[in-house]
Amino acid sequence: MPRSLKKGPFIDLHLLKKVEVAVEKNDRKPIKTWSRRSMILPHMVGLTIAVHNGRQHVPVLVNEDMVGHKLGEFAATRTYRGHAADKKAKR
């Protein structure tokens, strides 16, 4: 269920401060974060945010279509390697 409009979007304060500094300095270095729960705001567009997926930081280049989504949606935590092949079918 989506968050109430009267509450507004959630973003961790430490990430918000890093984003504001990067926008102010026009810095294009990736911002490293573990906050997958934070929502993407309009002033993040154009920034690269390295989102942790449990093993490494995945770089996510934010564009206009991503606004309103959570950062964790763009860094997959599970890798699907496919089902085991049937040995009889290979022959």
Curated annotation (Swiss-Prot):
Annotated organism of origin: Pseudomonas aeruginosa (strain ATCC 15692 / DSM 22644 / CIP 104116 / JCM 14847 / LMG 12228 / 1C / PRS 101 / PAO1)
Single GO molecular function: structural constituent of ribosome
RNA-binding is among the record's keywords: yes
Keywords: Ribonucleoprotein, Ribosomal protein, RNA-binding, rRNA-binding
Family, as annotated: Belongs to the universal ribosomal protein uS19 family.
Main function: Protein S19 forms a complex with S13 that binds strongly to the 16S ribosomal RNA.
Protein name per its UniProtKB record: Small ribosomal subunit protein uS19
Biological processes, Gene Ontology terms: ribosomal small subunit assembly; translation
Gene name of the record: rpsS
Listed GO CC annotations: cytoplasm; small ribosomal subunit
UniProt lineage: Bacteria, Pseudomonadati, Pseudomonadota, Gammaproteobacteria, Pseudomonadales
Annotated coiled-coil segments of the chain: none
Highest taxon of the lineage: Bacteria
Signal peptide: none
